[in-house]
């Protein structure tokens, strides 16, 4: 999708507890379709240190992503959400880069995502990877079979 150029500049930053309402609202846009799992405002506030948000000048939060520790050396990129009006404006890319930076800061060796959108994650250097423990955990509860990972 081509990037839109008429949007206000965005800043990716660490989330704070004050962002919990906006982050939950963004995630909720993608829950009915099954793309994302729901997150409560309490969850977002409690784990705000694991979220990054994309904020547009004058428009507030237009995207979010969550870094979830899977093991001491592996983390998962979750809850990647971009406001519909901001699709194609580079917000998702900025959030993926923000999560990668956070994962590197925390010294994770591998970052992975579970998704059906292989092309999206391949754009950012993720490759299909088998994580047997993850496959066993999610095989009965998830319709997402693609695991995409990259070394950091």
Question: Where do the PLM segments sit?
Answer:
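A generic "binding-loop/recognition-motif" signal
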Residues: 19, 73, 116-117
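A short beta-loop-alpha structural element at the N-terminal edge
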Residues: 10-23
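Active-site rim helix/loop that mediates acceptor-substrate recognition in acyltransferases
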Residues: 26-61
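Conserved acetyl-CoA-binding loop-helix of GNAT-fold acetyltransferases
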Residues: 82, 88-101, 113
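Conserved active-site alpha-helix within GNAT-family acetyltransferase domains
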Residues: 105, 109, 115-142
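Conserved beta-strand in the GNAT
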Residues: 53, 59-68, 73-81
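Short hydrophobic/aromatic beta-strand or adjacent loop that forms the aromatic wall/cage
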Residues: 49-51, 143-149
């Amino acid at each position: 999708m081509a990037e839109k150029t008429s949007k206000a500049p965005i800043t990716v930053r660490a989330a704070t507890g004050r962002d919990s309402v906006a982050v939950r609202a963004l995630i909720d846009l993608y829950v009915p379709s099954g793309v994302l799992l729901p997150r409560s405002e309490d969850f977002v506030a409690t784990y705000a240190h694991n979220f990054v948000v994309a904020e547009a000048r004058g428009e507030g939060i237009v995207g979010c992503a969550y870094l979830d520790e899977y093991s001491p050396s592996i983390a998962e990129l979750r809850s990647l959400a971009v406001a519909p009006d901001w699709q194609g404006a580079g917000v998702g890319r900025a959030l993926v880069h923000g999560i990668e930076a956070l994962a590197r800061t925390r010294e994770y060796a591998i970052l992975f995502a579970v998704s059906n959108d292989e092309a999206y994650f391949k754009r950012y250097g993720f490759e299909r990877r088998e994580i047997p423990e993850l496959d066993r955990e999610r095989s009965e509860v998830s319709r997402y079979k693609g695991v995409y990972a990259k070394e950091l």
